[in-house]
Design a protein with these regions (language model features):
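Sequence/structural signature of beta-propeller domains
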Residues: 1-335
Length: 335
């Protein structure tokens, strides 16, 4: 495994870029297995003229701290952090990060509650505040609210809003996706003052294949979102299927016309509400196989021809069988 300043570099679950300085930020979802919760700074070598992407360098590391200035405790402890996304907020000059939190379930009954939250920090990792989590997205010890590992996973920032998506369905919103049917998760929008402005249903795809054996494990949902403008976002839907591997699709979603479901206790798939619309942009399985655990989306530098650079990154899960992969694409129609 790669190391930097006595830390293990891995588990990179979110990336973003400061467009003013060109500095990149990479958050690790290490839950103190190796080191405390942290983010790295770095550089991506992308030629604005040719579009060639030739390398990645880590240049710094900072520990995420709590209100009292101490690092977050490790896995299995109250207040343990599970960082899943990071955004540079160019309108405030600070960083935002998504903490998926943790909770007990039938397989892990002794895990204590760690709150899911969208938090702010300065460029040194010091806590600066957090958004108010809607009551329907608070983690519990019962079969209510988000399931374990289905808390805040994707995060996006615009001039007027902060948006986060939970990876998969709440208990009340129905079962998780299977090869026969999809599911519904929730996308929440806050105003810049931290008040919830709305919540919208996001229709998740069914699994692209059945597990092998049929009773095998699966894990699927939204792994990241990225703002195009105030209403449109890119969304990564990622599935891991036992006996099949990873499958990832990139969608464009649009909130316009969607029903605000903030006050709805449950979202049946055929309910009387309108979800966000989604359009397939690319099946990422058509690129470099085998498909990795793609969890990151960020805008890179604008190219000389006017296209935006879209960077998609993977989380290696600190597993020698997987890799940290960064892919860059030239895209049109961006902000």
């Amino acid at each position: 495994m790669e190391r930097f300043e006595d830390t293990v570099v891995g588990g990179l679950s979110g990336i973003d870029r400061d467009p003013r300085t060109g500095t990149w930020y990479f958050v690790s979802d290490d839950r103190r297995r190796y080191n405390p919760a942290r983010f790295y700074t770095g550089e991506l070598d992308i030629d604005r003229v040719t579009g060639a992407f030739t390398g990645v360098r880590v240049t710094g590391v900072a520990t995420l701290t709590r209100r009292d200035g101490t690092p977050y405790p490790g896995y299995g402890n109250p207040e343990a952090a599970d960082p899943e996304s990071i955004r540079f907020d160019r309108w405030s000059g600070r960083l935002l990060w998504g903490d998926e939190g943790d909770r007990p379930d039938t397989a892990n009954p002794d895990i204590p509650i760690s709150r899911a939250a969208i938090r702010g920090m300065d460029l040194n990792g010091r806590h600066t505040g957090e958004m108010r989590t809607p009551p329907n997205l608070r983690l519990t010890t019962t079969e209510n609210g988000p399931r374990r590992n289905f808390g805040f996973e994707g995060l996006a920032v615009t001039a007027r809003s902060v948006t986060a998506v939970t990876e998969g369905p709440r208990y009340e919103d129905g079962p998780v996706p299977t090869a026969e049917r999809g599911a519904v998760t929730r996308l929440t929008v806050w105003n810049r003052g931290g008040e919830v402005r709305g919540q919208y249903a996001y229709p998740l795809d069914r699994l692209p294949a059945a597990p092998n054996p049929p009773s095998g494990h699966t894990d699927s949902g939204v792994s990241e979102i990225l703002a195009i403008d105030e209403f449109r976002y890119l969304a990564l839907e990622r599935a891991w299927i036992q006996g099949v591997g990873y499958r990832v699709r990139l969608y464009e979603i649009d909130l316009r016309g969607a029903t605000n479901v903030l006050d709805r206790d449950a979202l049946p798939r055929s309910g009387s509400y309108r979800p966000v619309t989604k359009r397939l942009v690319q099946d990422l399985g058509e690129f470099r196989p085998p498909v990795q655990n793609l969890e990151s989306l960020a805008w890179g530098p604008r190219l000389r021809g006017g296209e935006c650079t879209l960077v998609i990154g993977s989380d290696d899960n600190f597993d020698q069988r997987e890799m940290t992969l960064m892919m860059a694409f030239a895209v049109t129609g961006c902000r």
